[in-house]
Amino acid sequence: MAQQRRGGFKRRKKVDFIAANKIEYVDYKDTELLSRFVSERGKILPRRVPGTSAKNQRKVTTAIKRARVMALMPYVNED
């Protein structure tokens, strides 16, 4: 039989930043907002890292890709 664990810590649920701030349209020109969803190397973070919903993650990725095409955000950020 499986034993139950006692104690431990419960992981806090991540909050969707876009839904929490009631942002309906993710604008590609808002690079400050989009930089929250990009790693320091310039890669788009998977939705489990920032905790965004699937619907808002799709909005974020299309906005980031548009910003990259318009040269507002870099494709690769090398330090």
From Swiss-Prot:
InterPro entries: Ribosomal_bS18 (IPR001648), Ribosomal_bS18_CS (IPR018275), Ribosomal_bS18_sf (IPR036870). One of its GO terms (cellular component) is cytosolic small ribosomal subunit. Pfam families: Ribosomal_S18 (PF01084). One of its GO terms (molecular function) is structural constituent of ribosome. Keywords: Ribonucleoprotein, Ribosomal protein, RNA-binding, rRNA-binding. Signal peptide: none annotated. It comes from the Bacteria. One of its GO terms (biological process) is translation. Gene3D superfamilies: Ribosomal protein S18 (4.10.640.10). Part of the 30S ribosomal subunit. Forms a tight heterodimer with protein bS6. Binds as a heterodimer with protein bS6 to the central domain of the 16S rRNA, where it helps stabilize the platform of the 30S subunit. Belongs to the bacterial ribosomal protein bS18 family. This is Small ribosomal subunit protein bS18. It comes from Streptococcus pyogenes serotype M49 (strain NZ131).
